[in-house]
Amino acid sequence: MTFRAATLDDCPRLAELNHQLIRDEGHRNRMTVPELEQRMRSWLSGEYRAVIYEEGGEVVAYALFREQQEEIYLRQLFVVRHRRSQGIGRSAVDILWSQIWPKTKRLTVEVLVANGRAVSFWRSVGYADYALSLEVLPVDHAPGTVLKRTPTAP
């Protein structure tokens, strides 16, 4: 598998892959592919970098990340559907760790709790649970609605 830094010319393809990622992980994001392309252009023109992984001339995965002073935040890692469970994700992470990212920074990634395969994958490559984000959706706290409370132990 080869890899290269993504450029702005890659944004249309990255947007298509990002759209697949959103659908596959069950995210609520409703952005269209053109909107995702514009967002990707903005990210790559700013503080994000992307790496594209190819095999036999085919794009098989990509990673999108932002390097900060003390950490590297991996926003997205996506392997195309027909190439999953073939070691590509693990190889992509290994390339990031061994050839792209400095070894002196904390590495973070966020995963949707409902995406069990992704949670298992990240744990299998060395990431450990750190935080859990909880939310209340607008419909859940509309006027006149009382939030459900879980009884606490005495």
Cite the ranges covered by each PLM segment.
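A conserved beta-turn-beta hairpin within the catalytic core of GNAT-like acetyltransferases
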Residues: E67-R75, R84, K103-K105, Y130
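Conserved active-site alpha-helix within GNAT-family acetyltransferase domains
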Residues: R90, V113-A131, V136
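Conserved GNAT-fold acetyl-CoA-binding loop/helix
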Residues: E16-M40
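Conserved GNAT acetyl-CoA-binding A-motif
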Residues: I100-L112
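A short helix-loop-beta-strand connector motif used in the catalytic cores of GNAT acetyltransferases and
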Residues: R41-I52
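Conserved beta-strand in the GNAT
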Residues: I52, E58-R66, Y73, F78
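Conserved acetyl-CoA-binding loop-helix of GNAT-fold acetyltransferases
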Residues: V79, S85-S98, S120, S124
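A short beta-loop-alpha structural element at the N-terminal edge
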Residues: T2-E16
